Design a protein with these regions (language model features):
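Expand to "…catalyze enediolate/carbanion chemistry for C-C bond making/breaking, isomerization
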Residues: 1-272
């Protein structure tokens, strides 16, 4: 999975002003949203705009993605009418068979990112992740998932705590990246807090629906000077301990063993 993918910004498919704002947002991936953000009567227009939108986003340094409707809905028309994207997402995936049909219909070369939006889909995350070798990541939804669970969306996200934790574990075990659900409120402070929570769970990527959230969320998922300095401290202390014949080290009162050392090395390598 080349290039940074920290932020995945969903944009209304038929809104040219939103396409331009997305290009200025700093998001790593920009998603032309043909499902919930685009009413059926505007989908033909949105598909026709895909070539210009993708060119604009690629010029800005972003990855051009699209989210289509399920194939049993308007998905086939979406695929027929859009410019080939870098990444192809599909909404409401709950079975591996849906992924297999998507792969058969998808333009060659596009990565696949199924979206998990229901309890049934969550319980089959591993099967879905293994349904195609073209899958590079999976995304877990917020609004549709909350509706399926019969609860309400809140700023603290407690209603999705189990979903987000389980989804991350399932994706990690399957060997694909996990994209966290969006924070669907406008306040930047809340978006930052939600991104920090996701990072603590183990996420490296997050979806979003507000372009003003892109740069703050990128900052959360980008190691800062203090984090890098701490990682260097861990690596140095552990390597000194190993050279002295010890199997662990201590840094700031915390025991450092192989997994923590390896994580610090990965962090430093990611910024090399």
């Amino acid at each position: 999975m080349p290039l940074a993918r920290r932020t995945w910004l969903f944009v209304p498919g038929a809104d040219v002003a939103a396409h331009r704002a997305a290009a200025r947002s700093g998001a790593d991936v920009i998603v032309l949203e043909l499902e919930d953000f685009t009413p059926p009567e505007l989908r033909a227009k949105a598909r026709a705009l895909s070539a210009l939108a993708f060119a604009l986003w690629r010029k800005s340094g972003a990855i051009a993605a699209v989210r289509i409707n399920p194939l049993e809905a308007d998905g086939i028309d979406d695929l027929a009418g859009i410019e080939p994207p870098d990444v192809l997402m599909m909404s409401k995936v709950a079975t591996p068979e849906q992924v297999q049909r998507l792969e058969a219909a998808a333009p060659p070369g596009a990565e696949l990112v199924p979206n998990i939006e229901s309890a049934a889909g969550l319980l089959r995350t591993a099967e879905i992740a293994h349904a195609s070798k073209r899958i590079s990541a999976l995304l877990v939804a917020s609004e549709d998932m909350v509706a399926d669970l019969g609860t309400e969306r809140s700023r603290d996200g407690v209603e999705l705590a189990y979903v987000r934790a389980r989804f991350l574990v399932e994706c990690r075990a399957a060997g694909v990246e996990a994209i966290d659900c969006p924070y669907t409120f406008s306040d930047v402070k809340g978006a930052i807090a939600d991104a920090r929570y996701a990072k603590r769970l183990g996420y490296r990527m997050k979806s979003l629906v507000d372009p003003s959230h892109a740069k703050p969320i990128n900052a959360v998922f980008t190691p800062g000077p203090r984090e890098l300095a701490h990682a260097r401290k861990i690596v140095a202390a552990f390597e000194r301990a190993r050279a002295a014949g010890r199997d662990r080290a201590k840094v700031d009162g915390a025991l450092i063993e192989v997994p923590i050392y390896a994580a610090a090395k990965r962090l430093l390598a990611s910024r090399a």
